[in-house]
Amino acid sequence: MQTMTETLQKLIGKPLVESTDQEIYLALLDLVRSKSAAQVRPVNGRKLYYISAEFLIGKLLSNNLINLGLYDDVRDALAAAGKSLSDIEEVEPEPSLGNGGLGRLAACFLDSLATLNLPGDGIGLRYHFGLFHQSFADGLQNELPDPWLNEHSWAEKTDITYPVTLAGKPYTARLYKLAVTGYEGRTNTLNLFDLDTIDESIVHDGIQFDKTAIAKNLTLFLYPDDSDEAGRMLRIYQQYLMVSAGAQLILAECAARGCNYHDLADYAAIQINDTHPSMVIPELIRLLGEKGIKFDEAVKIVTDTCAYTNHTILAEALETWPRSYLDKVVPQLMPVIEKLDAAAKKRTNDTGLAIIDADDRVHMAHMDIHFTHSTNGVAALHTEILKESELNGFYKLYPEKFNNKTNGITFRRWLLECDPALVKEIESLIGPGFRKDAAELEKLLPYAEDANVLQKFSQVKADNKKALADWLEHTQGVKVDPTAMFDIQSKRLHEYKRQQLNLLYLIHQYFEIRAGHTPAVPLVSIFGAKAAPAYIIAKDIIHALLTLSKVIAADPLVAPWLQVVFVENYNVTAAEKMIPACDLSEQISLASKEASGTGNMKFMLNGALTLGTMDGANVEISQQVGNENIYIFGQTSSQVIHRYAAGDYNPADWYEGDPNLRRAIDFLTGPEMLAAGKEENLARLQHELKTKDWFQTLPDFNAYVVRKGQALSDYACDPLGWRRKCLINISKAGFFSSDRTIAEYNSDIWHLGE
């Protein structure tokens, strides 16, 4: 039997010691492809098709090597030749197929499906430049293309194409296939569609391009800027390309397995991930009509086949489109949507549940709920809010459709791959069973009283912090003190996630330190976030944080105690460095606004403690670990919802009534900030906080300051107690495995393989 060294040298055609990192990477790509192909299994019974606008899959080499059981052999073979697997990984570009939690969840779900030996493929688009590559200049976010495709991409071109009609014109969707390996499981597929006519050269001045040149631009960017009509139309073009090609793929695959279309629900389960793929419902009905199936039967078939996941409580994210847009882009769908609307209106007199409303807007989520057999939320609190308030009318109409599936994360990437030293310590105590059964982490609980074990885990954290400090210096040009407390808020930049609350805290700390009230421990506050190109206030928050970072660094009194670092172009690769090094995880969204969150789970799994509101999955984390092992603050979701309903929140009252808050907000346009930043951006953010503050930052400010102060004090003054809390968090993280989530989806909704 060949050794790994011999296998790689045969693939490369020369000794490893003489091979470049690029040559070794390509050899490993070939090796993974051949091994993953051997894990493809035949499909019997029902197969899942998970349709999502984004899949934030991250780099794939190490993840695939781990899942295929090759990682240790490859690492050792390379080391023997004086090579480093981490250097080889640098050759690999990160796929630009997603942006935030929605896309990362989809990627975790694909991993778990394959690991659990369940037949389930993804369907999405092959974006060329992703959302954008973020860079900072003059304290401002700039957007550039984020290229990743090359001839050696993991996504392999096929000869399979499907015709798609957009605005009456014919286009040809090309299928690319990307293998998804499971941990000691099967290989599934991520199906990505593209047009051969895409022209990357039309992009100029950052991420500007002609939004009307559909044949050239359709898959260039994820979520093209929708601040104008052309951008909004482009999103509909994208969504229809995805669902039309996807629906044709599903029907073709099912027919090849013996489906006669009448029995489609016995062959396929389709999960609609948020509202972007909603048009798959009318498109499937239209295609079944072309197969000779009458409308009413087609509606029943599609309803029995499709299920919908709601990911948001924010009205802005529940997509609605002007009927005129759909008339132009997908005129072939409008007769179907009109019939569906008429059918829905026969079921209820509640006009608020209509698919087409009185203003001629088409509500995608409404179509999803009416014409799928399942609607799920993604955390217990989120699902209750949907049932009791946001979607209450639908819940009264279809109580049997509503269910909860609390999100999860794949422990292969977020523990085995990104924190191998922690894995080694865990295995030395409880064995390797947790790799396949995350619930086994609970066996760590008795060690929470073992000071020697706690010290070893603490050393792993210290080493990870040193590694992050080195990475920050190498990639960001920033030096940080690895012995300081690392406080991290990394997630999409949005006012409801409240990076602005953290900003006000940091300004407050700046004043406290200048007044001689030094904190219990030096604090390094690390951010990672992209703001949507047209989201002005979000970009102003980034500017304020970057400006504050400069002000603090220039102050000899404050700099030894406080540092603000904003990581440029936050992505999965950066997350894999930051999460294992975190001490305090910031999960501070306004209660009732975060559906679930999954960053909270990743940080917890890697031994960080959570500072958070009772929102999303924070609620379930607190239930798992106990209130004494998490730092909860702020209003409850019911208090927030009541305040919105009363309509009596006036941020000016809080600004005028709290000297510390007023001092922090005034500082945004104080001489120190204006000397380092731009008045237009800082004044606009200040005005927003004083006059609007839609996500109630000000009422939670004092509670946040107090609770964060308690966390710093505990970290500095009771290190043993802090370590104990960290170990308890790790031991209780098993519930948040995406394997558990997927098993629940399968038992309650999909019934795959049956």
Regions found by a protein language model. Name each.
Residues 1-754:
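A conserved ligand/cofactor-binding region detector
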